């Protein structure tokens, strides 16, 4: 697990790590549609809502770490959800992963967690090493 430190990872998680003022979410769309990305803080309060045009296949959204009022948010864990809306008005949750850079490894009992800045995620949720 220590070999992952310093690497950017693709992670199966609804928690996007805001690191150095940036959070990255990758999502898949079956076709062209509008994607509404909602980000909430640890208290469950809405922080950012962004609407982007999604194309069929892989898409990415890079959050600049600001809230809807333009104020920079503290680095750490935020919860994300993505809802797709087709031109016909049909809505559905879109599958997504998050990207983050591993900054450390911790062990709690038998669990091994990766540190992504101020965010801690289970090692088992890592899908791939991006770089």
Regions found by a protein language model. Give the residues of each.
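Type III/flagellar secretion export determinants
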Residues: 1-131
